[in-house]
Swiss-Prot record:
Keyword tags: Hydrolase
Family to which this protein belongs: Belongs to the carbon-nitrogen hydrolase superfamily. Aliphatic amidase family.
Gene expressing this chain: amiF
Biological role: Is an aliphatic amidase with a restricted substrate specificity, as it only hydrolyzes formamide.
EC number: 3.5.1.49
Record's signal peptide: none
Pfam families: CN_hydrolase
Top-rank lineage group of the source organism: Bacteria
Protein name: Formamidase
Natural source organism: Helicobacter pylori (strain P12)
Domain CN hydrolase residues, every copy: 14-260
Length: 334
């Protein structure tokens, strides 16, 4: 399940490739077009180098970059679907692979900020999953909070795929939501700089362990004249151990074999540490069937729209003004 056996398609399961795409320096729409061409070229090259690969993943911001002075401008935004996603779809169809791509998506409501979106395209060239980032990296990211929930789709080798984006992976409830809906391979695409490198590794492992699912995570790599992006693609087993760990190299291709049926079997056969089941059946030895209400106050309050921390009134940062964003809501940064 490590790199030495990851050149061809396994007999069961599938081979995944996560691309540590160099952080793009983007100043114009031509730069975005160049990135798209580079991503498509990389997808075909990866398939040629790893003929058995069935899923190729590109990190957050690989299409449009992180030019914070322009990332909200109409010039930099794309539509989903649109001609750019059609180009990705054609590439997946030609290479006969599933692909995961990052798009900063124009909001259909012109009075609201754009979405940070991920899509999965199948080998027939169809968008089979569209996810809008639920938890933007506040206060620095200006994206509108996602409205599509946490979708799950069928993938290669018996997998059920879900995608989270960067900071989403720090929210354990979101990984649990994906697993609760059947996901057994949780993908994380990110554009993190080195400040949270350790936490990235930790949460990729914990998301796998808490939910008995594989995690496949990949980050941008390289320097954009402001920050260094750490790469470090990571594939974690459903028991929370790291199967493959990338380095900090731009263009590194992190590959690994995934066996979704093994995760499925663990969910069916494990007693001890089957925590996703135990959450809703606590104490099932003493009480047949267990207690179904976990009695967790924050879950009840969140569901009722009353979530509030004991220290919330005293928090210093609760809007984007520290980064110069307006606090009145509505569309800004055009």
């Amino acid at each position: 399940m490590g790199s030495i056996g990851s050149m061809g398609k396994p007999i069961e399961g599938f081979l995944v490739a996560a691309i540590q795409f160099p952080v793009p320096i983007v100043n114009s729409r031509k730069d975005i077009d160049h990135n798209i061409e580079s991503i498509i070229r990389t997808l075909h090259a990866t398939k040629a180098g790893y003929p058995g690969v069935e899923l190729i993943i590109f990190p957050e911001y690989s299409t449009q970059g992180l030019n914070t002075a322009k990332w909200l401008s109409e010039e930099f935004l794309l539509d989903v679907p649109g001609k750019e996603t059609e180009a990705y779809a054609q590439a997946c169809k030609e290479a006969k692979v599933y692909g995961v791509f990052s798009i900063m998506e124009r909001n259909p409501d012109s009075n609201k900020n754009p979405y940070n979106t991920a899509i999965i395209i199948d080998p027939q060239g169809k968008i089979i999953l569209k996810y809008r980032k639920l938890f933007p990296w506040n206060p620095i990211e200006p994206w509108y909070p996602g409205d599509l929930g946490m979708p799950v789709c069928e993938g290669p080798g018996g997998s059920k795929l879900a995608v989270c984006i960067c900071h989403d992976g720090m929210i354990p409830e979101l990984a649990r939501e994906a697993a609760y809906k059947g996901c057994n391979v949780y993908i994380r695409i990110s554009g993190y700089s080195t400040q949270v490198n350790d936490q990235w590794i930790l949460t990729n492992r914990s998301n796998a362990w808490h939910n008995l699912m594989y995690t496949v995570s990949v980050n941008l790599a390289g320097y954009d004249n402001v920050f260094y992006y750490f790469g470090e693609g990571q594939i974690c087993n459903f028991d929370g151990t790291t199967l493959v760990q990338g380095h900090r190299n731009p263009w590194e291709i992190v590959t690994g074999e995934i066996y979704p049926k093994m995760a499925d079997n663990a969910r069916l056969s494990w007693g001890l540490e089957n925590n996703i089941y135990n959450l809703g059946h606590r104490g099932y030895v003493a009480k047949p069937g267990g207690e179904h209400d976990a009695g967790l106050t924050y879950i009840k309050d969140l569901a009722a729209g009353k979530y509030k921390l004991p220290w919330e009134d005293h928090m210093k940062i609760k809007d984007g003004s520290i980064y110069g964003y307006p606090t009145t809501g509505g569309r800004f940064g055009k």
